[in-house]
C-alpha cells in the first residue's frame, strides 16, 4: 500500500512540475507582470497595505505587504515587506525570453525588489493578519492560541527583540480555540470580528481601550453555528451587518443591533460541504460570495437567500479564499487546495461558447493563475494597481502578478495559437 501511495505521489509531483514548466513558458503571453519570490518561511496570510509611493524618475512604485511566518520550531514573526512593482512601461515583453533558461529576463526574477521592513515577534504562526482600514499601522492577528493579538507597528522596532518575547499592544479575549476568520469594520473604527474553531464569532471594540493591562474582553459572542466557524466578514456598506460561514455548511447573516447573539437574522444551507470563506461585493450592497469544500463558489443576493444566484465551478479541490476585486463590480477571485487561483467575471455568465472553449471552463472563468506548485494559503488584490494580485503558497512562494490586458479587455490576442503550449497537453 505504502509503495502505491509513494508511486502516486511521485506521479503527481511529476505532473505538477510539468504543468509548471508549461506555465512558465507561456507567461509572456498570459501576463503583463509576474514576480516570484521565495520567502524565508511560508506565509499563511497576505494583504496589501493601502499606501503607495511613486519615486520620481523611477520605473517602479513602492507598495507594502502584511505577511506572517509559519516556521517549523523557530521564532515566528508578523512581517511588513516593501515591494517594488514596475510601472506599466517597464514590464517584461516576450522578447526577453531566455530559451536556454526557460525564463524571462526583466521581471521574472526579483532580487532586491522585495525587502522586509518590519519584523515583530509573534506567538506561534500567524494564521491571519489584517490591518485596520481607519489606521493601517494597526494590525490584528490570529494565533495558534485562542487570543487575537493587535499590534501598532509604529510602536515596535523594525528588528525584533532577539529574546523572542512577543508583546502585542492589545490582547483580545473571548475565544476558547484558534481560528482563521478576521474582519475589521470599514465603517466603525476599531470594531473587529473573529471566527473560531470553538463554533463562535467574537466582536471587540478596541477604541474603548483595555480595562486593565492590555486585555480587551469581547463586547459580544455570537453562538449560532454548530461547528467550526471558518470565516467572518463585515458588510462593507452597512455598519451593523456581518456574515459568517462554518463547517455546518451554513451561511449566517447577523445584525449587531439585534437583541440576541444566539440566532442570526438569516441562516441558509449554502453548500453541500464545509463553507470556508465569504466576501461581500464592495459595489453592490446585496451581493456576496461564499467558497466551499464542495469545490464551488456560490453567489448570493441578501434580498432572497433561499435562492443561490449562481455556482462557479472549475476548481478541483477545496476553496479556502474568495475575494471581490476592489476595482470591478463583476470580478471576483478564488483559490485553495488545487494550487490554482481562478478569476471570475459575472458579466460573462451564460455567454455562448464554442465546444473547444467549454472544455477549458465556463464562460465566466476569465483566468486561471497556474504559477503555484503547492496549496495557495491566501491572496490579496492590490488596491492601487488594478488587476495586480499577490498570492502566497505553502511552499514559501509569493507571487505578484497581473494578467495580460487583452484578457480582461476582450481584445483578441495577437499571438498565433501555434506559439502557445497547451497547459493540459
Swiss-Prot record:
SMART domains the UniProt entry points to: WD40
Superkingdom field: Eukaryota
One record GO biological process: regulation of DNA-templated transcription
Keywords: Chaperone, Chromatin regulator, DNA replication, Nucleus, Repeat, Repressor, Transcription, Transcription regulation, WD repeat
One Pfam family hit: WD40
Protein function: Core histone-binding subunit that may target chromatin remodeling factors, histone acetyltransferases and histone deacetylases to their histone substrates in a manner that is regulated by nucleosomal DNA. Component of several complexes which regulate chromatin metabolism.
Family: Belongs to the WD repeat RBAP46/RBAP48/MSI1 family.
PANTHER family: WD40 REPEAT FAMILY (PTHR22850)
Subunit structure: Binds directly to helix 1 of the histone fold of histone H4, a region that is not accessible when H4 is in chromatin.
Name used for this protein in its record: Histone-binding protein RBBP7
The organism of origin for this protein: Xenopus laevis
Lineage, highest ranks first: Eukaryota, Metazoa, Chordata, Craniata, Vertebrata
